[in-house]
A protein has these predicted regions:
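Alpha-helical packing segments of well-folded alpha/beta enzyme cores
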Residues: 44, 104-108, 169, 173-180, ...
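Acyl/amide activation-and-transfer machinery of modular secondary-metabolite enzymes
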Residues: 382-391
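Hydrophobic faces of well-ordered beta-strands that scaffold small-molecule active sites
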Residues: 2, 56-58, 119-121, 189, ...
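A solvent-exposed, charged loop/short amphipathic helix patch at secondary-structure junctions
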Residues: 14-36, 322-342, 386-387
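Catalytic cores of secreted or luminal carbohydrate-active enzymes
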Residues: 397-429
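Conserved alpha/beta catalytic core and glycan-binding cleft of carbohydrate-active enzymes
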Residues: 206-212, 216-372, 380-382, 417-420, ...
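Substrate-binding/active-site clefts of carbohydrate-active enzymes
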Residues: 7-184, 190-213, 218-219, 230-231
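Short, flexible loop/turn elements at secondary-structure junctions
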Residues: 5-10, 52, 57, 62, ...
Length: 447
């Protein structure tokens, strides 16, 4: 799964995509685009096709309230939902006529499907942009969680936390997801802060999707954590790590144990992981490749498909920036040079990718990880400029060898089905800790 923001994809002036489609849904429909129009180095849609990914995971594409829809310079990740069942207007060539955004989003999905690439939506049902919402106007305070003193719960750290355990909001969530799946042919849903949704609601969503034609193929996964304390009603269970056993098959969650074992804590910039030389974490790496089925992590999955191995996402630092910041050989008072392409950091990047791509389950990575994407040390770029967030297509050319390494890993997974095997009783595909020492593991995953 390749995580991508619609505007990031085509904002770079060097991308070769037409000006009228830059930052828009229709950028995904342009074929034959090349870097600076050189006719050689593929960008955009053709680049995606060449990479070998199975799915594009799009950051929020429903209507959100944090940017003026007619301001081409405005930028936000989009985790500010207003109208859950309407495409975002700032990604349409004409935000003032509703039919345009609907048609153009469908054209984007259709183009990706023709290329054999599935489309996953990032959905944010855990809060609304503000309290002046259609939900609040329908039945005041019914759709929101409250503390005993009457204040609105803020488990999202964005305010206005919704109450999935209430029957009508649960029903709304189920119908909304099914609407996107049926009307827009969406292939999967990533639930933001999934731990703010109760397990009963998540299972209801999975059940409803399974009843649709080929619905069992639709992916459902999310973040098994919340941002702050939640006033979820007593007697319901949050969809977090501790309750993974209460979730149906076909509902997965991001595995931060894998992430942190590989590169270190996302909350401490200078803390490294296995790829930085912390060999004491090698046991965690071996557990990760087997989907943590050995019970050594914080999760107790029934099978490896319940966990998503990853090392980078839109949150926190890009993988490249994190590796630069956590390099143990960097002097504490020295500023890292994020544009310097040194072999040491490139090796760590390759090793991190090699581990993720040889884990059981369905790996996930942030767009640009494959060419050392940098945001120059910005760890939370949700409302930074598009210039900082854009996909730098020149960098993709400069790091062509790293891109080819990722292509090779993706081809390896397609060729050997054992990498995706998730059955709990499946023979271990890789190796045991007492058979291969950490240094040998590192050598096996390094070109």
């Amino acid at each position: 799964m390749y995580e991508l923001h619609v505007k990031d994809f085509s904002s770079d002036p060097h991308c070769g995509i037409s000006d009228k489609h830059r930052g828009k849904f229709l950028a995904f429909t342009e074929e034959g685009t090349t870097l600076n129009g050189d006719g050689i180095h593929a960008t955009g849609f053709d680049y995606l096709k060449s990479l070998g990914i199975s799915h594009v995971h799009l950051l929020p594409v429903f209507d959100f309230g944090s940017v003026p829809e007619d301001d081409a310079e405005a930028f936000n990740w989009g985790y500010d939902p207003v109208q859950y069942n309407v495409p975002e207007g700032s990604y349409a060539t004409d935000p003032f006529h509703g039919e345009v955004r609907i048609r153009e989003m469908k054209e984007m999905v259709q183009a990706l499907h023709k290329a054999g690439i599935g489309v996953i939506m990032d959905v944010v049902y855990n809060h609304t942009y503000n309290l002046d919402s259609p939900l609040q106007k329908t039945v005041p305070y019914y759709y929101y969680r409250e503390w005993e003193d009457g204040t609105i719960s803020n488990g999202s750290d964005c305010g206005n936390e919704t109450a999935s355990e209430r029957e009508m909001f649960r029903r709304f969530m189920v119908h909304s997801v099914c609407y996107w799946a049926k009307e827009y042919h969406i292939d999967g849903f990533r639930f933001d802060l999934m731990a703010l949704h109760d397990t009963e609601t998540m299972n209801a969503i999975r059940t409803a999707l399974n009843r649709m034609p080929r619905g069992e193929e639709i992916l459902v996964y999310g973040e098994p954590w919340k941002a702050a304390a939640s006033a979820m009603q007593e007697g319901y269970f949050p969809s977090d790590k501790q309750n993974i056993g209460r979730l149906m098959d076909g509902i997965s969650m991001f595995c931060d144990d894998t992430r942190d074992s590989i590169k270190g804590s996302v909350f401490i910039a200078a803390e490294g992981g296995y790829v930085n030389g912390k060999e004491r974490l090698s046991a965690g790496i071996l557990s990760a490749t087997d989907g943590w089925m050995d019970g050594k992590g914080a999760y107790e999955p029934r099978n490896a498909s319940q966990l998503i191995p990853y090392v980078s996402a839109h949150d926190n630092y890009t993988l490249w920036d994190k590796l630069k910041l956590s390099d143990p050989k960097r002097k504490e008072d020295a500023e890292p040079d994020f544009d310097k392409m040194d072999e040491r950091t490139l090796s760590m990047n390759r090793l991190a990718a090699g581990i993720v791509m040889t884990c059981k389950g369905m790996p996930f990575f942030q767009a640009g990880e494959e060419f050392a994407r940098t945001k120059h040390g910005e760890g939370n770029s949700f409302k930074s400029s598009w210039q900082l967030n854009k996909i730098d297509w020149t960098r993709a050319l400069e790091q062509e060898e790293l891109v080819d390494y990722y292509r090779g890993l993706l081809a390896l997974r397609r060729k050997f089905q054992a990498y995706g095997t998730c059955e709990p009783d499946c023979k271990k595909t890789f190796f045991r800790e007492n058979q291969i020492p950490p240094v040998a593991l590192k050598a096996m995953l390094t070109p």
